[in-house]
Structure formats: structure tokens, C-alpha cells
Amino acid sequence: MAKVLVAIRVNPEDIDVDLDKLVNEIKARMPEKFEVVRHEKVYIAFGLYALRLFIIMPEEYEGGTEDLEELLTSIEGVSSVDIEMVTRTEAF
């Protein structure tokens, strides 16, 4: 069964948000069958960094990435999210 790999940028509310804690909070709140397989910090400007997450989710998940976006924006410290890429994969 194929899965979907989503690259999503998570923008913090401000420069003081601890991105390591934010990643742990996001991983803890992922629904069943969703997995953060990789994350990295992305420099924005003036000392501000965002998170780029690579998340595996079921291909047949109803609603696509909408629920994932809502979940991420509901977490304290998250200002907004941007879907950067969605691709089908059988590698995971």
C-alpha cells in the first residue's frame, strides 16, 4: 500500500519559540499512522528559523492534508504552516 510524503514548513510565532520542544510536541500529537520521519531548521531572516517537517501519512486518508494543517496550527507556538510538497511513495 502506498503512502504520501508531505513536506511542510511550520512557522513559529516568534524568535523565542524553542524549535526542539516544538518538534517533540508535534511528534507527540501526530495521529495514528502519521509519522514525522525527518525534520530540519530553515533560516528565514534576522535570527528567525522555521521547521521543515517530512511526514508520512496514509494515501487513502480522507481530507488530504487539511486535518494535518489544522492540528499543527492548533499547537502553541505555531503561527502558520505551508505545504511545500506532497508526493506518493512506497518507500515507507
Show where each model-derived region lies:
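Long, contiguous binding/interaction regions
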Residues: M1-F92
